[in-house]
Every structure is written in structure tokens, then in C-alpha cells.
Amino acid sequence: MSLKSLLKGFKRPKKIEFNTEANTPNYGKFVAEPFERGFATTIGNSLRRTLMSSIEGAAISAIRIEGVNHEFSFIEGVAEDVTRIILNLKQVRIKYEPEEKDQSKIIHLELKGAGYFRAGDLAVDSSIEIMNPDLHIATLNEDANLVMDLEIQRGRGYVPAEEKKKDIEVLGTIPVDSIFSPVQKVVFEVSETRVAQRSDYEKLTLEVWTDGSVSPDDAVAQAAKILKEHLTVFINFEEELEEEDDELDEADEKLKASLSKHVEELELSVRSLNVLRSLEIDFIGDLVKRSEEEMSKSKHYSDQCLQELKVKLSTLGLSFGMRDF
């Protein structure tokens, strides 16, 4: 059975509404409607759990301080003990995009004399961005000579220091509890909504707070993709294409298969997907029938989005304005 036939009769959202006035780099409010009864709760709860546990982020994973062998130590010239310094470092929120997958980064710091050690001091190059640079780490007096290395890694969820001890190779390295998740809070609400004369449909309102290293809309998109990939294992049948005439050659069959795909299979950016949702375009066949002028009517439209769509279509041998197929 084709996807179109499978979804026939289901009321489902065509687009997501963004509260552009209230949204910030750390907060986003999203509204989707209508859903069949029960679906808004299912989707809202699934998104919330995935957002809180499975979005990748960066955190400090281990430290090494010159002259210190364990966390129950004191450093000459530093007001805070090592335990307090570690607790403060655990609160640092970091944006780090490695050049290679799973690549960690070592930050080397040398702080001498009186002053304050703040999170912003960790931004030693352009690959590191500290989201809370004013966070206090330690207070140094004129006798201080703090030399330390910090390891930054990417990961998911919460990883306790105990789990990292087996991977420590350098003497004096102290593992740190890592809170990788950039999502700090997620709240969803399900309420009734009306479609024509029926008021038993549902509206999903989703609010997301992040530390700023990932925008709320990107976090939601990542969570949705993670859920989608986990659900594909439960699809144990193939989408069947409509019966075709024997005279259709292989190229025609390939074209029809491409046109019947959902637009999400183009692997578009969040902004481009929002353009398609606002125009109620669900399938590639619907997309190629539109002209470039029609696409510009979306409030989410930009030249960059149009260029991305044109490139994605061209890889399938398609383009805008195709009406005769």
C-alpha cells in the first residue's frame, strides 16, 4: 500500500507555527494542529523524552592540573579547592563542532597572578564557543600559578565520572561528570481544536529551552529525525507503486518512484522544510508542479532555501514547473 493511501482520512498537521516574537536562541514555542485524538500526546511525549536525552552536545570530560593528583586537593594561590573548581566546570555550556567525528579537544590554560578564572577563558580559539562566559570558576591571588589541561568531548545525555575512569591513561587526570545535553527543559501541552464542525481534534504546543549551543528549532528537528529512524525498523513492508503500463521504460519508473516520495526524504534544512509545510507540499510530485514564483509566497521563503530545493531536485533529474508527467 502506498504512503498516500495509508494516510488517507487522517487529519494531521500541514505545518508548524512558530511564535517568532517570543522565540530566542535559547527558547522556542511550536504549535502543530490538527491531530487525531491521542496522537498529539503520543508525539509530544516522544519528542520530549528524545529532546531531553538524545540531542548531542559538548562538555568538559576530564581535567589535569599541574601539581594535583586527585580532586580532594588545594592549589596554592587559589581560593577554591579542586572539588569546587570541578563543580563549577561542570556548569560550563560549550558549543564545539570538531573537524572529525568523535574528535576531542584539549584546552591548555596558564593563569598567573591575581584575578578571576571565568568560563570565557576557555574559548582559546574559534572552534570553541562558551555559552555562559561570565560563569565564575575560581578566584586567584598574586601567588597563583594555575596550569591545567581540559578535555572537551561531544556526547549525549549524562555520563558520570565513574564510567570514564577505565579510559584514563595519563597520571593525574581527573574525570568529570559530563552533562552533554544542550536541551535544558521541555514542556508540552495538548488541547482541543476544531476542524470544520468537529471539535474532537487535538493541538500540540511544545516549548523548548536550550543552552544556546543548539537552537530550539534545530533540536526539535533532530529529535524528530531520531524518532523517525528508530521507527523504520517496524516497517516490514515495501511501498507499492501503482500498476504501470508495460510500455513504461526504466526511466519512467524511476521518475514515478521519485515523485511519490515524501519531501522529507530530500533531507532538507529545517527552514526549507518549513517553506514546504507552509505551502502544504507533502510529496515531491507536488513540489515540482510549483513554479519558483509560487514558492516565494511562503513567509519562510529565502533565496537560500530556493537554491537548496533546486539542487536537491536536480540530483533526481527534476526541476520546478514540471506539470506534464
Curated annotation (Swiss-Prot):
Region (Alpha C-terminal domain (alpha-CTD)): 254-325
Keywords per UniProt: DNA-directed RNA polymerase, Nucleotidyltransferase, Transcription, Transferase
InterPro entries assigned to the protein according to its UniProt record, in alphabetical order: DNA-dir_RNA_pol_insert, DNA-dir_RNA_pol_RpoA/D/Rpb3, DNA-dir_RpoA, RBP11-like, RNAP_asu_C, RNApol_insert_sf
GO molecular-function term, one example from the UniProt record: protein dimerization activity
Region annotation Alpha N-terminal domain (alpha-NTD): where it falls in the sequence: 1-238
EC number: 2.7.7.6
Signal peptide boundaries: none
SUPFAM superfamilies per UniProt: C-terminal domain of RNA polymerase alpha subunit, Insert subdomain of RNA polymerase alpha subunit, RBP11-like subunits of RNA polymerase
Gene3D superfamilies reported for this sequence: 5' to 3' exonuclease, C-terminal subdomain, DNA-directed RNA polymerase, insert domain, RNA polymerase, RBP11-like subunit
GO BP term, pick one: DNA-templated transcription
GO cellular component, one term: DNA-directed RNA polymerase complex
Catalysed transformations (reactions): RNA(n) + a ribonucleoside 5'-triphosphate = RNA(n+1) + diphosphate
Statement: the UniProt record of this protein carries the keyword Nucleotide-binding: no
Subunit record text: Homodimer. The RNAP catalytic core consists of 2 alpha, 1 beta, 1 beta' and 1 omega subunit. When a sigma factor is associated with the core the holoenzyme is formed, which can initiate transcription.
Domain topic, free-text comment: The N-terminal domain is essential for RNAP assembly and basal transcription, whereas the C-terminal domain is involved in interaction with transcriptional regulators and with upstream promoter elements.
Role according to the record: DNA-dependent RNA polymerase catalyzes the transcription of DNA into RNA using the four ribonucleoside triphosphates as substrates.
Family: Belongs to the RNA polymerase alpha chain family.
Protein name (Swiss-Prot/TrEMBL): DNA-directed RNA polymerase subunit alpha
Taxonomic source organism: Leptospira interrogans serogroup Icterohaemorrhagiae serovar Lai (strain 56601)
Taxonomic lineage from the root: Bacteria, Pseudomonadati, Spirochaetota, Spirochaetia, Leptospirales
Gene designation per UniProt: rpoA
